Structures are given as C-alpha cells and as structure tokens.
C-alpha cells in the first residue's frame, strides 16, 4: 500500500525587499520536490502581509500575476486545519520571514515547519546578536562597532570618534536586520561615515560598522538538527568591489568556484567553524555560513549566517550540497524530514511539560 503524501505549504513572497528572490526560490523547490512523497501547495504572502489562497498563489508563483492590493487574503490557520497540512516550508528571505516572526506564528498554530526555530531565526537575522553569539562561542569575527539610531541622533560626533578609534579604514556599514547586502556601503574615508549610516538607517534602526578587510569570500552550507553536517566550501569571486545586492541579483557579474581552491586543512577549518556558527545561534534544518579569508595573513573570519539562504537551483546553498554529493531533490526531501523530526521532538517536550503541570495541579 502506497504511503500517504505529505502535504507541504510552500510559503513564499513576504514583506521584505527580497520578495522577488523568494519567488524564484519557491519556484525551484516546487519544480524539484519529489512528487511521489510530497504534495506541494504554494501559499504567497503578499508585500502587505496578506496570505493569498492557493489558486492566487499559484498564479504569482508561475509568473503570470502579481499579488495585487485588491486580492483578498484568507485564513491560513483555518485552511491548514481544513486541508490537514502536514508541514510548512518557509522560503521567505529577510524581515518578517527569516527573523523569527513567521516561525513564531507557525509555532502558535501548531504547524511543523522547515528550518530554524524562533530563537535561531531571530539571532541569525540580527547582525548585532549574531556577532555577540559568535563572540560568546569564541569564534573569529571582524572588529565592529554597533550603532543604534537613538545614539546616532543624540551624539554623532562621539560615535564617529568611537568608530575611528576602534576600526581601521575602510569600513563596511550595514543595517543589522537586512539580507542580500541591502543597504550596505563600503566607506573609504571618515567623511563618508555619516552618509553610509544614514543609508543603513533607512532599512533598520540598528547599524553595524565593521572593519573592512581584503579577503576572499567563501561560503559553507550546513544541514541538520542535533548533528549538523557541513558541505564543501565554495568561493564567490565578486564582479564588483564587494558582493552587493546588484551583483547578486541584477548585474550577475560574480562567479562561483565550487569547491573553493583551498588546502585540505583550510577547508576542514571552514567546515568545522560553519557547524560551530550554526550551533552558536541555535539554528536547525539548514543555513549558509559566510566567511572571509584575509589575503596576506590567510586568517579566517566568520562574516554571517543565513538561516533561509537563497534556494534556487543555481544558488550557492544547494550547489554546495550537490558538490558534496547530495542532489537538489534529495536535499529538499531531507529538509522536510528534518522539519518533521524537529517538530515531533518539540511536541513530545511540550506534552511532557503539560502533563507535569496537570500532575502538579492534581496535588493541590
């Protein structure tokens, strides 16, 4: 007797600047997911936060329509229960998708999901918290200065001095909560700092000013829950001065070298650090960990972790696993299985906690 297909709600779109990137990732997943095991049902979250029903979501995913303001949303929670959806696969990058907010909603309605939980997502999205987590785990990071909007508005001169005393030029100025290099500026002079911070503050009220280094950019994919594994490393050779949003998604002048041309020892170091970074933020399911390898010194620095990395067939995350002998359809299958596994364990712990409370109540 054939086993029942798992019903998977493929969540895509979202409210962030990476809405269109999410559509590309979702399209690739839907096309490649093993049809014998999964029924993939697309659910688009419009730019204003409305959940669109499957028929309208299908039109958006196929490229024949956009989520218009006049489209009516629907009750996702009621639909999940009515259709007996088994698991959600959120592939929404950036704010309100990768930062723990969507994950918290899925926890509340009791729907299993692929990827990191609330805490891992939130820490992985916020570059301040991420850096603090890496530092607490004694992982190598580039020197940085955190700048809040409130501090910047109240005393720009003091903060400028703090930055100039703590870091060497050039600097990279980044919003703390934005993906795909949105709002990032490379600053080559002290006079350029105010404009770069103002630009970053358009995207978030927290900014990271980081020491710029002349480095190779290398990435490692991580997969798993309690026993995560790391892929072979891959290198990005940027077509611009640094690997920014335009280079990633518009001009596409960068190239990927997979596997990266590294010594066996350096490759193993990166894989070990990638797993350590994954654990440091409390991630699960999948993440991509980005590194700098400084030219001249060959020192390795952790740049950041992405808990919902780009997931098209040509994105770095799946390409690294393909080079590690895990094909794209099998990778999707593994991620859904990991989501189900994680949800089962969380439910068992929750049920155990509730039984304990009931036992305590019965004694009073």
What are these regions (language model features)?
Residues 185-272, 295-301:
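Phosphate-binding site of ATP-dependent enzymes
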Residues 2-6, 138, 263-364:
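ATP-dependent carboxylate activation and anion-phosphoryl transfer catalytic cores
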Residues 104-113, 189, 194, 323-324:
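A glycine- and small-aliphatic-rich helix-loop capping segment at beta-alpha/alpha-beta transitions
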Residues 27-28, 198, 275:
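Solvent-exposed alpha-helix faces
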Residues 40, 112-113, 141, 171, ...:
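Hydrophobic beta-strand scaffold residues
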Residues 2-12, 16-17, 82, 123-216:
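Active-site nucleotide/adenylate-binding loops and adjacent lid/helix of ATP-dependent enzymes
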């Amino acid at each position: 007797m054939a086993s029942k297909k798992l019903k998977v709600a493929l969540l895509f779109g979202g409210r962030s600047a990476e809405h269109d990137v999410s559509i590309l990732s979702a399209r690739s997943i839907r096309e490649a997911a093993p049809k014998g095991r999964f029924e993939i049902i697309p659910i688009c979250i419009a730019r204003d936060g409305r959940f669109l029903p499957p028929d309208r979501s299908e039109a958006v995913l196929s490229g024949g329509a956009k989520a218009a303001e006049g489209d009516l949303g629907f009750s996702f929670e009621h639909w999940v229960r009515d259709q007996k959806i088994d698991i959600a696969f959120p592939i929404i990058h950036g704010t309100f998708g990768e930062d723990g907010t969507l994950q918290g909603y899925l926890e509340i309605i009791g729907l299993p999901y692929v990827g990191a939980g609330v805490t891992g997502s939130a820490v992985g999205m916020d570059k301040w918290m991420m850096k603090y987590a890496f530092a607490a785990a004694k992982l190598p990071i580039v020197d940085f200065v955190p700048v809040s909007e409130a501090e910047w508005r109240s005393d720009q001169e003091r903060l400028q001095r703090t930055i100039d005393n703590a870091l060497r030029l050039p600097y990279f100025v980044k919003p703390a909560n934005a993906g795909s290099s949105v709002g990032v500026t490379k600053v080559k002079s002290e006079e350029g700092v105010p404009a770069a911070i103002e630009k970053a503050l358009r995207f978030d009220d927290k900014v990271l000013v980081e020491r710029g280094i002349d480095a190779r950019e290398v990435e490692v994919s991580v997969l798993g829950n309690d026993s995560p594994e790391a892929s072979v490393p891959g290198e990005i050779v940027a077509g611009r001065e640094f690997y920014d949003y335009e280079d990633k998604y518009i001009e596409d002048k960068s190239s990927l070298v997979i596997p990266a041309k590294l010594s066996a020892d350096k490759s193993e170091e990166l894989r070990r650090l990638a797993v350590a970074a994954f654990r440091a933020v409390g991630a699960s399911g999948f993440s991509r960990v980005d590194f700098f390898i400084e030219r001249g010194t060959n020192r390795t620095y952790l740049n950041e972790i992405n808990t919902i990395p780009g997931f098209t067939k040509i994105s770095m995350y799946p390409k690294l696993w393909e080079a590690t002998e895990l094909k794209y359809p099998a990778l999707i299958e593994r991620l859904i299985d990991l989501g189900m596994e994680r949800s089962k364990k969380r439910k068992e712990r929750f049920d155990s906690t509730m039984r304990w409370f009931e036992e305590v109540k019965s004694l009073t």
